[in-house]
């Protein structure tokens, strides 16, 4: 995945094993992630997580997720978390890892109770393409995401990052420039580049 610094055009990389792409090369890929982390070639680990739509059993996904979380923790990197119908399992994994690293809930689109649970556990919340739909769950809860935990993404959608910023800023009742400043501060705090 790519991590792009707001307003700078600089591109940094994350590396992870997405739950949809678990195969027989997992050990080799984990070694590559660890090597990239050790050599400072990535700024985060992920996407990593649990997706109940994936072919791999949830138990296999969880074990792999926990191993990637360990790598992130070992090298002091944030973890970009993918979760589909598996938030309780991810929060349990967070507690089990006793992680002091920052975890980013990628592509958040869930109800208020889930948002509050993630926030209680220290997660950052990344809003993206789902925020463009005024009927979506994330659109409804956007004003409730604390400014110091908010990130913006596109996740390769048909929307530009500018469009997502515009929609999120309108929903929160702030100027796009203010939202860019908020995200920049969060980005700097998370990635320490």
Predicted regions and their residues:
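Mid-domain alpha/beta scaffold segments of enzyme catalytic cores
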Residues: 1-193
